[in-house]
């Protein structure tokens, strides 16, 4: 084993997960399949930049999510208010599908040099967020609308310090972080996000099955309002592969910065075909985001008493995402690379690119 590999145990972790997942998918092959319309989903997402040789700015993030089964109409608890949000209605029995998801998430941000104990006013602040989300969406194979509510906190209440120290020091996955005494102080966070997407081009429905190549093209936009993020985003997404699902791209933005959902589509009027076969497909997303407020970038009071200045500009306004999706019900794995386009904003010393790993189990 080389010294470089010893210093990067996350490489072995990633390879282990890639090796284990196919075996897990076959483990339940002999069991009687459950009604596909009754399947709920548990998803775990892990975000990190060390997989691309960096460990700063957006250092890490994770979320655990519970997604509802696929429904073709809202139940009484949601129809009276979610169903009245523009685009989020259902068409009654046999129309669009609707779903909800709830999640818990954490984000960790650090300066480029985590070995420095003193304040670093010329770099990203030490900061962490912890939040709960509720998401609701309605879609078919042509259009999608989604709404999300985020409630959380920024500061020591996020326990980002304890999590990073446990991973770096107790597990030995990185250099001991020494500057958490300078993290941004506690503040409450709340955000409301709304998204709409529309498919410009889609192949015939018969092509959305395992073993057949399919592709489609969509555009969309998202608006976020709150004291975590206030922004407007526009995007274009291209999907292609073998066994492409109907619906839209799964974009694994950290909850609050994006919307937690599973935007696939099943036609309620048609039987599900080959649900339990392998699907492998890809997506390419280009988007631009106009940001007017992002809590960690605003600086502010810190636990050591100094005032961290705001960043000169907001990071991550122009992005290209490339995703790989491997699914065989009840398991799924998704890998998405976030590539930020353009020069890095002043005040950011390190790279802001990162990778998301998502693991799913339907039950």
Range-by-range predicted roles:
Residues 121-123, 160-169, 175-187, 224-226, ...:
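Extracellular/periplasm-exposed beta-strand and loop segments of Gram-negative cell-envelope proteins
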Residues 28-39, 70-98, 139-146, 200-217, ...:
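Short loop/turn motifs that connect adjacent beta-strands in outer-membrane beta-barrel proteins
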Residues 56-62, 126-130, 145, 186-192, ...:
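Residues that define the transmembrane beta-barrel architecture of outer-membrane proteins
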Residues 85-163:
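Long, hydrophobic/aromatic-enriched structural stretches that serve as scaffold segments
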Residues 42-48, 100-108, 149-155, 196, ...:
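Transmembrane beta-barrel strands of outer-membrane/channel proteins
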Residues 36-81, 332:
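N-terminal ordered "arm"
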Residues 1-35:
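Cleavable N-terminal export/targeting peptides
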Residues 112-115, 237, 243-363:
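Outer membrane beta-barrel transmembrane domains
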């Amino acid at each position: 084993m080389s010294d470089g590999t010893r210093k990067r145990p996350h490489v072995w972790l990633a390879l282990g997960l890639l090796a284990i997942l196919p075996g897990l998918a076959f483990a339940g092959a002999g069991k009687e399949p459950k009604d596909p319309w009754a399947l709920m989903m548990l998803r775990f997402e892990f975000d990190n930049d060390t997989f691309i040789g960096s460990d700063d700015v957006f250092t890490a993030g994770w979320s655990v999510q519970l997604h509802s089964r696929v429904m073709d109409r809202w139940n009484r608890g949601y129809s009276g208010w979610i169903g009245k949000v523009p685009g989020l209605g259902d068409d009654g029995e046999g129309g669009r599908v609707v779903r909800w998801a709830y999640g818990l998430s954490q984000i960790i941000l650090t300066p480029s040099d985590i070995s420095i104990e003193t304040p670093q006013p010329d770099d990203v602040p030490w900061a962490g967020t912890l939040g709960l989300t509720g998401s609701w969406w309605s879609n078919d194979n042509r259009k999608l609308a989604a709404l999300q509510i985020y409630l959380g906190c920024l500061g020591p209440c996020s326990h980002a310090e304890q999590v990073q120290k446990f991973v770096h020091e107790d597990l030995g996955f990185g250099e001991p972080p020494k500057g958490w005494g300078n993290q941004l102080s506690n503040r409450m966070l709340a955000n409301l996000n709304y998204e709409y997407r529309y498919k410009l081009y889609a192949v015939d429905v018969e092509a959305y099955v395992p073993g057949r190549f399919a592709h489609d093209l969509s555009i969309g936009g998202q608006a976020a309002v709150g004291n975590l993020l206030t922004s407007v985003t526009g995007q274009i997404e291209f999907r292609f592969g073998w066994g492409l699902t109907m619906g839209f791209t799964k974009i694994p933005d950290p909850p609050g910065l994006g919307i937690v959902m599973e935007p696939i589509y099943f036609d309620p009027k048609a039987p599900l075909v080959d649900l339990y076969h392998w699907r492998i497909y890809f997506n390419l997303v280009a988007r631009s985001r106009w940001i007017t407020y992002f809590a960690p970038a605003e600086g502010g009071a810190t636990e050591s008493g100094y005032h961290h200045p705001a960043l000169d500009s907001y990071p991550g306004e122009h992005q290209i995402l490339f995703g790989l999706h491997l699914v065989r019900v009840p398991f799924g794995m998704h890998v998405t690379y976030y590539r930020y386009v353009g020069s890095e904003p002043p005040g950011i010393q390190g790279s802001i690119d990162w990778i998301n790993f998502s693991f799913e189990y339907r039950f």
